[in-house]
Amino acid sequence: MAPVARQANVPVIAFSNDRHVAGNGVYLLGFQVEPEVARVVGYVAQRGMRRFAALIADDALGKIAGANFRQEVARVGGTIVALQTYPPTANGVLEPMRAISTQIRSAQEGGAAIDALFVPGGQENLEIIGRLLPQAEIDTDKVKLIGTGGMDYPNAGRDAMLVGAWYPGPDPRGWNEFAQSYAKSYAQSPPRIASLAFDAVTLASALAGGGEDQRFTPAELTRAAGFTGVDGAFRLLPNGTTERALAILEVQQFGAGILDPPQSLGLAQPPASALSRAVNFD
């Protein structure tokens, strides 16, 4: 689709999070893992936690997360003490988890304990990891679990082993208001991707009021003022990726708690009442 749209000089707003398809008229609204890794590693390092272990799926997302994890740990002056990858199968993670556990215990016994265990991914692999943490004898009271935005799924807090984990994501209050309004109107919960669809419509609406020759031009799409949607402030960049204001969240038994509010992008934030009106489906 992108080549056809490019020939017609029509920009494409994609829900993808694969930055390899960004650019040349394609702009990604999806949450990209690279800034998420930078946000969570930076937050942890600010709290004096600089010795890391990582358990990463050997898949496309894992490769991106792993490469950026190495880069960000080096940037903050940290050390990756242990790193294991695992095949994305139901039973593939147990042996790598046991290996990580052994390395964590060895570091503790050697007087240089590991501070945080990085486990990027989403619900499918995190539920498996959560179930296996006790078998692998990894004590999450001593080693802080950290992840990416994939931890932001319903009922993550039902798994006691994931409670207390830290991850980056948008301020959940915008999504909660959106989901409540959606459920009231349609008697069902919205899929998580619905916020991206809503934000895409919001973006289009914001730009549609300009002069006909100015609508949806690269300059307007990447305007410094950015946009504000259900998932907070965001700015489209000339390379097709998206800069977002990400908070640091903590998995709690019921929902997520905000540990560190979204970092400012220098964009004006609308009052909560404005967002509430915007997501009214009645």
Task: State the predicted function of each range.
Residues M1-D282:
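Extracytosolic ligand-binding ectodomains
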